[in-house]
Amino acid sequence: MTKYFRHFWWAWPFLALKIFIFYWQTDRLDMMNVYEVPVLTVLFLFGLFEICSMGRGKASRWIFYICYTVITLVMFADAAYSSYFGRYISVNQIYQLTSLGQIAGDGNVIGAAVSPGCVLTLIDYPFVLYFYRLRQKGGEALATMSMRRFVPYVGVHALLLLAMVCVWYYYGCNPYNLRSVQKVNHIEFFTYHTNDILVNVLGRLRRGEVDEDAILKTMEELVPRSSGKEYKGVAKGKNLILIQTESLNDFVIGAEYNGQELTPNLNALLKEDTFYFNHFYSTTGVGNTSDAEFAALNGLYPNDVRECYRLYVDNTFQGLPWILRGEGYGAYAFHGYTKTFWNREEAYKTQGFQHFYSQEELTMTEVSGFGLTDKEMFRQAVDILKEKPQPFFSFIITLTNHIPYELDPSLASLVLRPEDEGTTFGGYLQTIRYTDEAFGKLIEYLKEAGLYEDTMIVIYGDHQGMNMETPSVKSSMSRFLGKEYNFDEMLNVPLIIHIPGLGEAETIDTVGGQVDILPTIMNLMDVEPGHPFIFGHDLLNADEGFVAQISYIGKGSFITGDNNMLFAIGKDGTVESGSVWDLRNGEKMNRNNALCQQYSDRATALLDTCKEVLDYNLIAEYVTH
């Protein structure tokens, strides 16, 4: 028996090390004051080891091997996902493996996005399996135990199993819907994934009826409002080119580096016939780039379940492509990568695009990094568009400024400082400069094709390019900005609306997000959506600015212009452990819990209500295609 327990103690340090590394790599060590978290993880992990050790046969051994392998892989996935998105992975993300597989060939993409420290979650694996085998061999079989030893041995293990089941049910299932339990479920590994499966798998099976009137009432109360008709129809009848720019952060606009303008062409654009929104924020869900598209095209929030291009591929939509087709426009999409990425090939059909030009159809004359270079994309797009009947709507997604920001040296024009050579930060500035040059070329191509004067150009960033969760990036960015780099800068992407002949240039500081692009464009083009389910508002006539957040800082986070603050909810899902930044100077603010709770509830309700609209395909009741 002494030998039996000795093998258990040998395994203990490695199990404890696994728990420590996991919560360290997912940045949750500071939440261990919620005592249930370490207690529950220890109970489940040590309990699994102990109970499986009771058996002496191959079945027990393989049950443990399989269970521990799954736990280890999920912990690794959680650590990797959290290092970029700040949250654990969900069962819904299993569907993203197809997209991951498409970019896995470029290890630099994944390497730049994921913290190398995640590999440490695997370090215990061979040792625990080895000591488990010794434990199993060194123990006494139940059949040979005396009754005096058998009864307490089995009794203790039965109580351990009962405790595991009861605790798992209470915390993982949360039958009484307690807030204190929800807090634990945001942090603790086993109960988070139990709750995630229950909510996202079983929850769909229990879906009931929807109250459309209640949804419309909620929208009336919570969706930010716009009043007035300023600039209505100033772009009516014009062609529309909507450009989603990969990883374009707002901090590069007007900035200089090493005595060089980072975005000279965009800077020039802002001086004439342009609206520039400098407090504009990404509203991506778990679909990241594809969800940015979804929000911009439809005025709908993505969600934290799954990328909308897959989850709602069979829904009926009435976004920009369908609205403008109803006005006699042609609708075309361009992307210099494979057409199946993010399920675009299928999703674009329901979005209303008549043709999707991807790498399978474009000429891959110049490739750098992730796909067709931006200059070549713009050149080929204009060549195609000038042959199309007018007016047209063109949606273009750029690619050159994609992580890991590796630009062919022949295309690089920015002179980097020695300390920034070979870094993610330096690479980002280099590709940003190239993308800006591409915008200059786009204007030239449009003028040469005779399209410029009759075309409204809308440019926005899809999501952050510099992830503050990466220590080296945060350090470089803080040095560049002259202040600590935080979420207020990271989530800030530009929105630029250029209308030749507008006759004015204005910087607008109204807080907005990608859900506001559709209603803002509708006002400028004087068109209507034909349904009431628009969750954004016209930023040119906004009464207030409010944006709900999903990814990176978590559901329940928000950005509001009324109080000039960005609020990031705590990783335990509570307002009390959240953080607040002042949008005016980027400094941390004292948290007003009551006010933050009010806004947080509003943000959550907006996301939940929008999800109901999508889950029940309510737009289909208003339109037919």
Protein language model features and the residues they cover:
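Transmembrane and membrane-interface helices of multi-pass
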Residues: 2-197
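Solvent-exposed soluble domains appended to multi-pass membrane proteins
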Residues: 217-625
